Amino acid sequence: MERHIDISRFDYDLPDERIAKFPLAERSASKLLVWRGGEIAEKRFADIGDVLPAGELLVFNNTKVIRARIVMHKLSGARIEVFCLEPHDPADYERAFAVTGGCTWSCIVGNRKKWKEGYVEINFERGGCAEHLRAWIVEDHGREFVVRFEWTAPMTFGQLLEYLGRIPIPPYLNRESEEIDNTRYQTVYSKFEGSVAAPTAGLHFTPELIGEMKARGFAFEEVTLHVGAGTFLPVKDEDAARHPMHTEHFEVRRATVARLLEKWGHITAVGTTSVRTLESLAALAWRIRTAGTPDAGRVVGQWELYDIPAEFSGREALQELSGYMEREGLDRLKASTQIMITPLDYEFRIVHNIVTNFHQPKSTLLLLVSAFVGDGWRRIYDYALGHGFRFLSYGDSSVLLRE
């Protein structure tokens, strides 16, 4: 099937002053735009419990942003920045952060022209001892490189990044990361290291707000999707259908699948990363239905979900997945996805409501919003621009209700 998406239809003027460069003093003090059946209202994020349907299940992405930027130097003194994207060997995230002595990662290299051979290093002191971290390029893939790290300190790679690395805030903030970003560019429920960008819809939640919502009967579950740098890649082709989606790794627990099935029809995804994770489950379930296995080692393709029969419902998908995990004795399922959710007749199977920030013009995230609300996305963004809403990662939020 030939697909075409004119990306110019998803453009709008976003003045730089409307991009939130820093977070508000209080997470839940942000504004909340409410879209309900074509009607727009304005609330505070702290009041989201008054907006969502009673008893709704909210699904968080509990990934944690790593300090992925490491500034190193050549022996000549040249400054080289190594941006760790995802583990290469060991490739498993948990093992990659627990390893000691050495590992390899897929990275972006800043000032590459000054690093043609040899190693770069950073010297540091730990526990009164002089230590060093060194890095070599072992594979050149153009934009990305496989980099070998070796270090002397008795530390895991996760501890090393925490000690030496810097938080990779979005490039459109046009500033260096600061101390405030170490805490505020993380959700309060972040647990598992692996992301190089935050699932920003969740930045508005506080422990107090979550506690209040639980007391009112709202339920919460978590999935893990490690957000890659590809989330910031603009759609450069005038036909967005030719845009190659980035791959992101995700994980879901059997208990979460069971809860999703129990609450099907009342599921609110907090953020586009939660949307992509939940919707990708339908592809794994269809593989089980048709081939007896989710084939989790094979990436969920960019258009795979569009080829699944419309009558295969989200409830059926969750039943298939739950049954398979129970039969196989799997407590959790790991997979990867390149799913691209667009207005090309995409059928949302798992997600019923979405909490999300305001996204960049001509972005795949804006296509996802359009897939959910149709042409109403422009009314939403016109309202937000006209009523003082702050945009992008540190900006305000919206809740999109299908009612």
Write out the residue ranges for each language-model feature.
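Surface-exposed, charge/polar-rich loops and edge strands
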Residues: 1-403
